[in-house]
């Protein structure tokens, strides 16, 4: 019976993936009607815990794999020993040999039980990944849902105008947000709690208010874009945020726990947009450029100037890089563009705020790192790029940059 059930689940996983790759309509229906069930049940369950459940599930998974490898090595060793003793055992028939053989037999029975458990665990991982991640890659895009088809005919003038708007917003908001005596950005929660400096015990005052505000902003965005409506779990800080920094990762959506997780070691102005970005994945928008765009909208439409500033900062680099790329790859088109509209200058304060991790944190992280940050970053880049391409995102990590096209499309229509 268990074998039949195992292969039935395997068949279901294959069928779901075949359907997903061949029918966007099926994926859209699944995200609209089935996917929210997992968020509202399992997501609420894992949301009870104040820590990232997904993080510890990954640790447990690594331990299970390590145990499987260790048991495999031991089984191989015992197998060779048994092979070498086979003839002597039958010739001698000694008690000691029989006892050793009996003990080996018990170990192999335990090993079989463990591998049976490991097989079912691996099957569960494949099923959860299919239901909570892989199907999402083949659904209709956010822009197709709400903006219509993109004709792709955007001019360099439109790009620079959009860049100027974002740069000028950043310049303005950089002067409006509250700052400490040292000039560091300060988040002020609705109850007046200030969060600024991260010490050995974390952020002073905690980031719970910011996480709740991110969820509220996403729910408000759902009034205009129905697929974003509904309940959101509170984003959670990751215990292994130092390791996240070494990967240059700001956050993770864990399909195994239905959680939005963020790196709480990075600069505080990265955190609001990251929270909203990861929450966007919990509404079925798995593409990174779409999550970037949704996060941007949620932040800039906030009444909190800190969230607004964080939202504009989150896309500034993408726009700046595209303008720079225009200048480097097509100087003639760039000259024609600047004859119409000059790119705006970015203030020194914005450049100071526009960082991933502070120098002090980098010194601390690299000072205690077991593996060099460059090695971890390179490995993470390969993993993320490969994962995206396997799931049908042909340009891999470069797809993050497509948020610029979504911004151009949005502002043209609005």
Residue ranges of predicted features:
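Active-site recognition of the HExxH zinc-binding catalytic motif
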Residues: 50, 273-292, 296
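Post-HExxH zinc-binding segment in Zn-dependent metallohydrolases
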Residues: 286-333
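Membrane-embedded alpha-helical segments of integral membrane proteins
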Residues: 12-82
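Alpha-helical transmembrane segments
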Residues: 2-9, 53-60, 73, 111-122
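Contiguous, non-catalytic segments that form substrate-binding/exosite surfaces or channel walls
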Residues: 91, 95-100, 104-258
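Pan-zinc metallopeptidase signature
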Residues: 349-414
């Amino acid at each position: 019976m268990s074998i039949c059930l195992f292969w039935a689940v395997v068949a279901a996983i294959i069928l779901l993936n075949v359907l997903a790759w061949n029918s966007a309509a099926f994926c859209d229906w699944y995200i609209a009607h089935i996917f929210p069930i997992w968020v509202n049940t399992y997501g609420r369950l894992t949301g009870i815990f104040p820590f990232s459940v997904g993080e510890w599930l990954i640790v447990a998974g690594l331990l299970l794999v390590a145990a499987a490898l260790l048991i495999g090595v031991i089984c191989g060793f015992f197998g060779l020993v048994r092979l070498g003793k086979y003839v002597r055992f039958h010739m001698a028939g000694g008690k000691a040999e029989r006892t050793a053989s009996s003990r080996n037999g018990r170990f192999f029975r335990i090993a079989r039980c463990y591998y049976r458990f490991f097989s079912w665990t691996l099957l569960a991982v494949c099923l959860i990944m299919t239901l909570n991640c892989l199907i999402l890659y083949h659904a209709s895009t956010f822009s197709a849902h709400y903006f219509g088809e993109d004709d792709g005919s955007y001019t360099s003038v439109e790009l620079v105008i959009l860049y100027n708007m974002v740069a000028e917003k950043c310049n303005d908001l950089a002067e409006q947000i509250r700052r400490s005596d040292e000039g560091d950005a300060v988040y002020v929660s609705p109850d007046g709690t200030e969060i600024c400096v991260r010490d050995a015990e974390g952020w002073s005052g905690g980031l719970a208010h910011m996480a709740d505000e991110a969820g509220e902003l996403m729910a408000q965005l759902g009034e205009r874009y129905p697929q974003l409506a509904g309940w959101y779990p509170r984003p959670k800080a990751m215990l292994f945020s130092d390791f996240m920094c070494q990967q240059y990762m700001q956050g993770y959506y864990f399909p195994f726990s239905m959680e939005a997780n963020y790196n709480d070691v990075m600069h505080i102005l990265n955190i609001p947009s990251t929270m909203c970005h990861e929450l966007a994945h919990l509404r079925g928008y798995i593409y990174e450029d779409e999550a970037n765009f949704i996060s941007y909208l949620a932040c800039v439409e906030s009444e909190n100037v800190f969230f607004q500033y964080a939202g504009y900062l989150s896309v500034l680099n993408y726009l700046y890089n595209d303008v720079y790329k225009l200048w480097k790859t097509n100087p003639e088109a760039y000259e024609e563009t600047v004859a119409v509209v000059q790119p705006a200058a970015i203030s020194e304060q914005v450049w100071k705020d526009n960082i991933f991790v502070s120098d002090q944190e980098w010194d601390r992280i690299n000072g205690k790192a077991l593996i060099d940050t460059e090695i971890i970053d390179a490995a993470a880049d390969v993993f993320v790029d490969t994962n995206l391409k396997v799931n049908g995102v042909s340009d891999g990590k470069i797809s993050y940059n497509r948020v610029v096209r979504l911004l151009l499309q949005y502002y043209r229509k609005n």
